[in-house]
């Protein structure tokens, strides 16, 4: 049984946020993380491709081509990076774009790699230009070109590197420079999960946590998880708390529904912030079109928060449209709130 008593994460501002809420939540994610491609649920196309590329690299005794994983947060990019290293039977070194401030930071990592090791850089779109320039020859030729000294005494030193695999992860592939993007031989986009796969993930997590949970309870959690395993596992922990107090730890569909309703997560995975936004568009602006600034003023949120946090899921699920004239509620939004559809 996993020991999780001291790993319970504090509830984030939005329980349906896809970002990791805390260090404690990250620790629990690691405990629940699948270790092999066979255990990894969902992302069938990416998983099938990686399995073939990994087997081919091992068969030839070569380093795997550099891998770029992109897609919304919480879908398993970090998990896949760990699995790639595990399947290759090599070490994984992990860092993130913002941490690599100077060329020396990257050089220290690269020169300590063993042959065929995996270097995982999360948020790779946030690499500084200086570090990115150093990375190019390392990716192409397994070589570092570093300037030592300053002024007339400066000289270039070339350092040979062992063959290695860079796995880069990003939620914003469009922010990668073309030269960096072109150096990845394998590019995989991770998609939002189907409810069927999320139900399997919730059931697996419940089993690891030794929870008394039936399939209907897992389905109830899955369908409110916004297609995101990280959210599913977070909701599962809160449902577990509710079941421990209200139903002797037994989680069925009714208990899951009651727990998630108490948390203001409705049957479509919308929370208070989502509903507040949609209700403003529907009731205050007649369903739209309405400008972003007007909606932001009406609900007391910044335009950045609306664009980056609220709107993506609503658009992806078909509750909202962005048009040249502004935001418009869709037919699905009217039906969700029990309103007559505007013609």
UniProtKB/Swiss-Prot annotation:
Region (Large ATPase domain (RuvB-L)): 4-193
Binding positions for ATP per the UniProt entry: 32-33, 74, 77-79, 140-142, 183, 193, 230
EC number: 3.6.4.-
Region named Head domain (RuvB-H): 267-343
Record's subcellular location: Cytoplasm
Any single GO BP term: DNA repair
SUPFAM superfamilies xrefs: P-loop containing nucleoside triphosphate hydrolases, Winged helix' DNA-binding domain
Catalysed conversion reaction: ATP + H2O = ADP + phosphate + H(+)
Keyword Signal applies: no
Gene Ontology, cellular component aspect: cytoplasm; Holliday junction resolvase complex
Gene Ontology terms, MF aspect: ATP binding; ATP hydrolysis activity; four-way junction DNA binding; four-way junction helicase activity
Xref: InterPro entries: AAA+_ATPase (IPR003593), AAA_lid_4 (IPR041445), DNA_helicase_Holl-junc_RuvB (IPR004605), P-loop_NTPase (IPR027417), RuvB-like_N (IPR008824), RuvB_C (IPR008823), WH-like_DNA-bd_sf (IPR036388), WH_DNA-bd_sf (IPR036390)
Key words, A-Z: ATP-binding, Cytoplasm, DNA damage, DNA recombination, DNA repair, DNA-binding, Hydrolase, Nucleotide-binding
Binding site for Mg(2+): 78
Region (Small ATPAse domain (RuvB-S)): 194-264
Protein role: The RuvA-RuvB-RuvC complex processes Holliday junction (HJ) DNA during genetic recombination and DNA repair, while the RuvA-RuvB complex plays an important role in the rescue of blocked DNA replication forks via replication fork reversal (RFR). RuvA specifically binds to HJ cruciform DNA, conferring on it an open structure. The RuvB hexamer acts as an ATP-dependent pump, pulling dsDNA into and through the RuvAB complex. RuvB forms 2 homohexamers on either side of HJ DNA bound by 1 or 2 RuvA tetramers; 4 subunits per hexamer contact DNA at a time.
Subunit field text: Homohexamer. Forms an RuvA(8)-RuvB(12)-Holliday junction (HJ) complex. HJ DNA is sandwiched between 2 RuvA tetramers; dsDNA enters through RuvA and exits via RuvB. An RuvB hexamer assembles on each DNA strand where it exits the tetramer. Each RuvB hexamer is contacted by two RuvA subunits (via domain III) on 2 adjacent RuvB subunits; this complex drives branch migration. In the full resolvosome a probable DNA-RuvA(4)-RuvB(12)-RuvC(2) complex forms which resolves the HJ.
Listed HAMAP family: DNA_HJ_migration_RuvB
Family according to the record: Belongs to the RuvB family.
Domain-level remarks: Has 3 domains, the large (RuvB-L) and small ATPase (RuvB-S) domains and the C-terminal head (RuvB-H) domain. The head domain binds DNA, while the ATPase domains jointly bind ATP, ADP or are empty depending on the state of the subunit in the translocation cycle. During a single DNA translocation step the structure of each domain remains the same, but their relative positions change.
UniProt xrefs under PANTHER family: HOLLIDAY JUNCTION BRANCH MIGRATION COMPLEX SUBUNIT RUVB (PTHR42848:SF1), PTHR42848
Protein name in the entry: Holliday junction branch migration complex subunit RuvB
Source organism per UniProt: Neisseria gonorrhoeae (strain ATCC 700825 / FA 1090)
Source lineage: Bacteria, Pseudomonadati, Pseudomonadota, Betaproteobacteria, Neisseriales
């Amino acid at each position: 049984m996993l020991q999780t008593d001291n790993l319970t994460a504090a509830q984030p501002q939005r329980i349906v946020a896809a970002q990791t809420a805390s260090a404690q939540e990250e620790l629990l994610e690691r405990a629940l993380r699948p270790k092999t491609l066979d255990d990894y649920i969902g992302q069938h196309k990416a998983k099938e491709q990686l399995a073939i590329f990994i087997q081919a690299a091992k068969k030839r005794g070569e380093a795997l081509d550099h891998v770029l994983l992109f897609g919304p947060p919480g879908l398993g990019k970090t998990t896949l990076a760990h699995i790639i290293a595990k399947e290759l039977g090599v070490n994984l070194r992990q860092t993130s774009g913002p941490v690599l401030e100077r060329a020396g930071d990257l050089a220290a990592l690269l020169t300590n790699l063993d042959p065929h090791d995996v270097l995982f850089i999360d948020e790779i779109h946030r690499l500084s230009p200086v570090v990115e320039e150093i990375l190019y020859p390392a990716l192409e030729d397994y070589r570092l070109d570093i300037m030592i000294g300053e002024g007339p005494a400066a000289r270039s030193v070339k350092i040979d590197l062992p063959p290695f695999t860079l796995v880069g992860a990003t939620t914003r592939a469009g922010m990668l420079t073309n030269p960096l993007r072109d150096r990845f031989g394998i590019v995989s986009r991770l998609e939002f999960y189907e409810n069927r796969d999320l139900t399997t993930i919730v059931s697996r997590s419940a089993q690891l946590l030794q929870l008394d949970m039936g399939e209907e309870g897992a389905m109830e959690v899955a369908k409110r998880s916004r297609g995101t395993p990280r959210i599913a596992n977070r909701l599962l922990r809160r449902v577990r708390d509710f079941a421990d107090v209200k139903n002797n730890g037994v989680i069925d569909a009714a208990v899951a529904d009651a727990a998630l309703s108490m948390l203001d997560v409705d049957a479509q995975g919308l929370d208070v912030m989502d509903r507040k936004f949609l209700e403003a568009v529907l009731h205050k602006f007649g369903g739209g079109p309405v400008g972003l600034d007007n909606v932001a003023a009406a609900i007391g949120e910044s335009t950045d928060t609306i664009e980056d946090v609220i709107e993506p899921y609503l658009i992806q699920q078909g509750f909202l449209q962005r048009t040249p004239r502004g935001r418009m509620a869709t037919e699905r939004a009217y039906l969700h709130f029990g309103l007559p559809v505007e013609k």
